[in-house]
Design a protein with these regions (language model features):
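OB-fold (S1/OB) nucleic-acid-binding surfaces
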Residues: 60-66
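Long, contiguous binding/interaction regions
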Residues: 2-57, 69-72, 78, 82-86, ...
Length: 165
């Protein structure tokens, strides 16, 4: 059994890095900094939900576009990233990261609340390729949340499975 090394209630950085942010219509590109911090005690092991009161705070700073900067609190890192992406989509901006690719989804989420990887949804039932949320992605592969969710539902129905399989 994997045990968490952090039982502290001090904020703990889970991930963060500089990424590329792209405007859908104009094609403008700019750097953005994404950071995710856990506030509260983490789960006792990887397959357990964090204790009540644990929040994940994702901060986005888009260089040269302060109007896009946001800070989001959510129950999981994926929820925080999803809410951040929704905010950007309203302004026609997208993050060029693996977590925004149409063909990627965090299928381990129901069992691993702190998961920070996405799987490529290929023609196999069990994904073979995993990437960190913030891994660089080809701008041609990124899409809206709706496109990504639609692709995931097609993948689920192809294998007659439920989310979390």
């Amino acid at each position: 059994m994997l045990m968490s090394t952090s039982h502290t209630t001090e904020p703990q950085r889970l991930f963060g890095r500089d990424v590329t942010c792209i405007h859908r219509r104009s094609g403008e590109r700019t750097a953005a900094t994404v950071t995710c911090i856990r506030r509260g005690r983490g789960p006792d092991h990887a397959m357990q939900a964090p204790p009540p009161g644990t929040l994940y705070t994702l901060t986005l700073q888009v260089h040269g576009h302060a109007e896009l900067d946001t800070t989001v609190n959510a129950a999981t890192p994926w929820d925080a990233l999803t809410t951040t992406r929704e905010h950007l989509e309203q302004h026609e901006w997208f993050l060029a990261i693996a977590a925004a690719r149409r063909d990627c989804w965090p299928i381990q989420l129901p069992r691993r609340h702190e998961a920070t990887t996405v799987a490529e949804l290929s023609d196999r039932r069990v994904p073979q390729h995993w990437q960190g949320f913030l891994a660089d992605a080809d701008p041609n592969d990124i899409g809206t949340l709706a496109e990504q969710q639609h692709r995931y539902q097609i993948w689920l129905s192809r294998y007659d499975t439920t989310s979390g399989s």
